[in-house]
Regions:
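Short, conserved SAM-binding/catalytic segment
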Residues: 226-237
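Core catalytic lobe of class I
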Residues: 1-224
Length: 237
């Protein structure tokens, strides 16, 4: 991939939960790929961000959805800290994604069902106050020139997923992708999802007139993604 190619990334990485889950009714669709040691997981994800530094434009944004799991709840915090300490990326915002349905089912005597997940908005440290967004100016103070913006909050309500039936259960929804694009990406932006899964990010890009690139290791998920994308593109012709 060329340097400075991408306007940004919208993705959700594997959560590293390749275990038999006693509090949930499914695996995440990556049972043969998602079982690294904690150190290996942190290293792999951090190395990915070092590569993102090369391919994402300086003012680009990464919307990174990662939730904790009962097996190792501290893992996302360790990862984001390592990314901040060892790469040129840092957190600009943290968005709370509210879903209509909570998981896992209430079978744990201690753990809460999660109805929200976090989306970390990461930008390059040199652009912490200058990265690109779609925030619209609502008014300007005539005396001082101070700009005031329409109200944008770090709380998004969106469906869990698109309801597509397949082995990959850990997916988000096109509705979520649309709401993130509306905040951070203008029409014609090139958005990458390095963990494409069944193509939800790409479908959201099509819906919002953005270009896209995706990567996917699992052939079954890739085939589903291509089928969904082709069907969506045909409907736009």
């Amino acid at each position: 991939m060329d340097d400075n190619l991408l306007d940004g990334i919208i993705t959700s990485p594997p959560y590293n939960i390749n275990t038999e889950r006693s509090d949930c009714y499914y695996n995440n669709g990556y049972s043969d790929l998602d079982g690294l040691s904690e150190n290996d997981y942190l290293e792999v994800r951090t190395e990915e961000f070092k590569e993102f530094s090369r391919v994402v434009k300086d003012k680009g944004v990464i919307c990174y959805n990662i939730s904790y799991a009962k097996e190792n709840p501290i893992l996302p915090t360790l990862l984001i800290t390592k990314i901040h300490n060892e790469t040129d990326w840092t957190i600009a915002d943290i968005i709370c994604w509210k879903k209509p349905h909570a998981i896992p089912f209430q079978t744990s005597p201690t753990k809460l069902s999660r109805v929200t997940e976090l989306i970390y908005v990461l930008v390059k440290k040199t652009e912490l106050h200058t990265f690109k967004t779609n925030k619209e100016v609502s008014k300007v103070n005539e005396k001082t020139g101070q700009k005031f913006y329409k109200n944008y909050i770090n709380y998004i309500s969106a469906k869990n997923n698109d309801g597509y039936k397949c082995k990959l259960k850990a997916t988000f929804s096109q509705e979520l992708v649309t709401k993130l694009i509306n905040i951070y990406f203008e029409k014609g932006s090139l958005i990458y999802d390095p963990f494409t899964g069944i193509g939800t990010t790409q479908l959201g890009c099509i819906n919002n007139q953005c270009d896209f690139i995706g990567s996917e290791l699992k052939e079954e998920h890739y085939s589903i993604a291509m089928s969904r994308i082709e069907e969506k593109l045909v409907s736009y012709v």
